[in-house]
């Protein structure tokens, strides 16, 4: 039986708050992948999240406010995921993170930020079956967007 889980690195800053995280979580729970996941672990840095508010989105969501220091970046979440993978080698893990939150909301990059998040979700969430097949051969699978300027 497939064992799968999702680890989300969330950085919460005053400008975006939890907007991108909520968008990502709602996207996840509206897709078939939610039935494959045993849990969704959100590891947050920066402004603490309202844990009951986020966990009430879906019963599989668990939130930890790891640190108020956003400059720790993704490292704590990657370490948590690494430790989990060592203890549970049969799990397939999806890693997502709140992209673009350091950019101002009203800047010219607002729409590219949303498309950046959408591309990550499309490649890993919408195409999860392909990712799971590839994980039978490879240790990691991900996406890489390359723009021609």
Q: For each predicted feature, which ranges?
A:
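ER/Golgi luminal nucleotide-sugar-dependent glycosyltransferases, focusing on the catalytic module
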Residues: 1-149
């Amino acid at each position: 039986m497939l064992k799968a889980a999702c680890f989300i690195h969330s950085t919460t800053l005053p400008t975006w708050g939890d907007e991108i995280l909520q968008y990502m979580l709602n996207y996840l729970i509206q897709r078939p992948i939610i039935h494959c996941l045993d849990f969704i672990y959100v590891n947050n840095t920066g402004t603490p999240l309202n844990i009951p508010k986020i966990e009430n989105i879906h019963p599989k969501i668990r939130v930890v406010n790891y640190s108020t220091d956003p400059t720790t970046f993704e490292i704590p979440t990657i370490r948590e995921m690494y430790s989990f993978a060592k203890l549970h080698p049969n799990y397939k893990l999806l890693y997502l993170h709140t992209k673009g939150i350091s950019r101002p909301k009203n800047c010219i990059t607002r729409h590219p930020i949303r498309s950046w998040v959408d591309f990550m979700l499309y490649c890993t969430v919408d195409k999860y079956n392909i990712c799971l097949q590839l994980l039978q051969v490879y240790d990691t699978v991900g996406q890489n967007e390359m723009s021609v300027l």
